[in-house]
Amino acid sequence: MDFLEALSRPPLVLGVDPRPTLHGPEPLAHIRRYTLELLEALAPRLAAAKFQLAFFEALGPEGTALLWELASASRVMGLPVIFDGKRGDIGSTAEAYARAYLEAFPGSALTVNPYLGLDALKPFFQAASRTGGGVFVLAKTSNPGSGFLQDLLVEGKPLYLHLAEALEREGERYREGPWSRVGMVVGATYPEAVARVRERAPHAPLLLPGVGAQGGRPLKGEGLLFAASRALYYPGGRPDLKAALEAAEALLKALVE
């Protein structure tokens, strides 16, 4: 499996953010069963499954084991995996993070934090290149306070656009065909930012969180992956397989028509 294959699939990404309080007296068992059923039902309609690492880490060792089980099951279903951990560190620590996710699961992707600089990102880029994976660098995130740093004007241009231009240059060496293995996270809640990043980084896959519960609206364009977590995993605020299928169909219709 090569992660870039996700870009030829339907553009919807299922965000898996399990909350044990919504899963009854045996939450781990119910999370496992519900997620496997949901993945199997939605797989043909998805580009990838995105696992938010914090929600599994919060469940302790059993949660980490469940993460690996669900990620492995996704791959067996032919569904690419995104590990949403926003990792970032220097040197050997970045290399260790890359081994933990990109090399342990070849063909998968990882979200990373650029605050430490491009040199701290290169171990992730190199691991993705070796393993057929991908990297999504935080650029313009979907949260309301993202502008505190990301919108700071530097030489008349917001910081996130400086980052986008630098990543497009760096990503050229990791490009295969029309797409680079170096992508970016840009919130669907900021459609103007999506357009500005795409203009400056035409070869970068863009992971767009915020569709659904956060109010981000569907956008058109190639190389866009729209992540929906609460709207798909917990439609109506609770586990509901039938409602999740209906929500996926509605989102896909809005995305592709």
UniProtKB/Swiss-Prot annotation:
Which Pfam families does the record match to this protein? OMPdecase
- Cite the entry's keywords alphabetically: Decarboxylase, Lyase, Pyrimidine biosynthesis
UniProt pathway annotation: Pyrimidine metabolism; UMP biosynthesis via de novo pathway; UMP from orotate: step 2/2
What EC number(s) are associated with this protein in UniProt?
Answer: 4.1.1.23
Give the matching NCBIfam families.
pyrF_sub2
Q: What is the similarity comment for this entry?
A: Belongs to the OMP decarboxylase family. Type 2 subfamily.
Q: Name one GO molecular function term.
A: orotidine-5'-phosphate decarboxylase activity
Annotated GO biological process: 'de novo' pyrimidine nucleobase biosynthetic process; 'de novo' UMP biosynthetic process
The main enzyme category here is lyase
Protein name (Swiss-Prot/TrEMBL): Orotidine 5'-phosphate decarboxylase
